[in-house]
Amino acid sequence: DLSLSMKDDLDTIRNLGTKLAEEMRKLTSNFRLGFGSFVDKDISPFSYTAPRYQTNPCIGYKLFPNCVPSFGFRHLLPLTDRVDSFNEEVRKQRVSRNRDAPEGCFDAVLQAAVCKEKIGWRKDALHLLVFTTDDVPHIALDGKLGGLVQPHDGQCHLNEANEYTASNQMDYPSLALLGEKLAENNINLIFAVTKNHYMLYKNFTALIPGTTVEILDGDSKNIIQLIINAYNSIRSKVELSVWDQPEDLNLFFTATCQDGVSYPGQRKCEGLKIGDTASFEVSVEARSCPSRHTEHVFALQPVGCRDSLEVGVTYNCTCGCSVGLEPNSARCSGTGTYVCGLCECSPGYLGTRCECQDGENHSVYQNLCRDTEGKPLCSGRGDCSCNQCSCFESEFGKIYGPFCECDNFSCARNKGVLCSGHGECHCGECKCHAGYIGDNCNCSTDISTCRGRDGQICSERGHCLCGQCQCTEPGAFGEMCEKCPTCPDACSTKRDCVECPLLHSGKPDNQTCHSLCRDEVITWVDTIVKDDQEAVLCFYKTAKDCVMMFTYVELPSGKSNLTVLREPECGNTPNAMTILLAVVGSILLVGLALLAIWKLLVTIHDRREFAKFQSERSRARYEMASNPLYRKPISTHTVDFTFNKFNKSYNGTVD
């Protein structure tokens, strides 16, 4: 993917060829690699089509103002063992820019699969196609947004310059077409995608046989390890694919893997090693009888292998007993032909022995058309004629049975589908196809979805029910019950291997470390990705009270991929004086704060009281009055008396 968002990834893989070749030559002595790139269809709305963008679609983009014109797919280097040519070709590449988020990656994958001569696929080699991107793909019918209504024809359209010429003429390929062409050319597709798109491409692997998906780092630094892991996974797995299966045939698979256990409904085995044997039993069932002398052919092929088994199917729908016919047989009351134990009545006659004539009144025998006394004739779903039921026709299906008590449409449904589409309805009960159980046949007995990358079922901490792990080990959880912090599992057993290489741990020398880690592949990192769905997170306390963390992923080869922190996470040792000063300072600050709050409250209270006093004083109105206790210094008294010293009376005042 050479869209603009992959610029940092391109910088990372410029010297990929040398390192990849070194690692792959540890696995195979005959290794070749090639290179191609894609962006998207060069039409609107997928790309910038205005004239100003024709030579530089990044014009006006401040972060990266210069890039090459957009293109669909370019095959840049045929498969070769010259690693320097690969590195040189990668160094020449520059990114481009498309308009929408999805990429035209499936156009590129299909051309890489069908252009065998130009790519250089060898007939007897194992074919790996590594597809890297950081976004979602365009799929079939998306091309209609750009006016492309012609479906993809699945053919090679590379010109002399090895450029895809039908990019702006045909729609994107469908997943079915992609899977067909990959299988037809024995190509194993590896989706190397960023974590936020992992689940989308994981779902694609269920629709495209022979594909695997791996999580790509944001800058593609792990691309080599990713390819090695996918290669080991492919080499340790065998899966059967079916080609040209007739519609009227049901195929039922039973796989017997390296453990010798048979798995009904499973068509693949994983975790295989050199010398292991896997066998498959295939049962063929005819759902209907085609016309006479019809012969069908289908093929069984291991995914990614060119060998196949072609199976020819002939149908035998005639019974041997039909040779001896007895016309007008006494067993049929002389009015019918006895064939294969049954009577075929002449026109106008009815009954199991042709004993009745059409139109006769046989109401006296109608009780023979009831299952039990009191029930409706023919269960209310048929007419009673000549002591037997003739069942009505129904738009929903077939009504049948001696008393019309059965049908093939009244069984349990799942999401609106009768018997979940995995069984046949017989008289109100689902008869499940091989590989399915349950009242409505919604429960698959296929345990491949519960098998981890290490070949274990539910990590041996649970059982597989309906294709999903039900964890029984206390504390276990995860899609494969692979996570269990409280279990005495690999976290404790792998701890010695993790501790041994650490210089400060006091563990034994390198020879001992080699012995402890003989089944481990250790990668040292500065930070641990804690939300990795594929990995199990482990941590423990060291002697220095630090926390050491690591993750592990079980590989199909039986080894484990350990990702370990370079240094344990340690907190700073607290200083006693610092703690003392902090405590004393805190107490003083709290005391001062309380005093300040108290002073503030008292001041507020006093101000309120003084304001209240001032308010009452301003409202007071007093009347003028004298003090009853006050006496003036001068007083006047009036006295009435009679003075008769001289025999005179006198009235007056005395001061």
UniProtKB/Swiss-Prot annotation:
It is found in: Cell membrane. One of its GO terms (cellular component) is cell surface. The keyword Cytoplasm does not apply. Residues 321-355, 356-405, 406-442, 443-482 form the I-EGF domain. It holds the Pfam family Integrin_beta. Disulfide bonds join C58-C67, C115-C156, C257-C269, C289-C317, C321-C340, C332-C343, C345-C354, C356-C386, C369-C384, C378-C389, C391-C404, C406-C427, C411-C425, C419-C430, C432-C441, C443-C466, C450-C464, C458-C469, C471-C481, C484-C487, C491-C538, C497-C517, C500-C513, C546-C570. The modification Phosphoserine is found at S626. It is a single-pass type I membrane protein. Residues 1-575 are extracellular. Ca(2+) 2 binds at D40, N98, D100, P102, E103. Gene3D superfamilies: 4.10.1240.30, Cytochrome c1, transmembrane anchor, C-terminal, Laminin, ntegrin, alpha v. Chain A, domain 3, von Willebrand factor, type A domain. Keywords: Calcium, Cell adhesion, Cell membrane, Disulfide bond, EGF-like domain, Glycoprotein, Integrin, Magnesium, Membrane, Metal-binding, Phosphoprotein, Receptor, Repeat, Transmembrane, Transmembrane helix. Belongs to the integrin beta chain family. Heterodimer of an alpha and a beta subunit. Beta-5 (ITGB5) associates with alpha-V (ITGAV). Interacts with MYO10. Interacts with DAB2. Integrin ITGAV:ITGB5 interacts with FBLN5 (via N-terminus). ITGAV:ITGB5 interacts with CCN3. Interacts with tensin TNS3; TNS3 also interacts with PEAK1, thus acting as an adapter molecule to bridge the association of PEAK1 with ITGB5. This is Integrin beta-5. It comes from Papio cynocephalus. The gene is ITGB5.
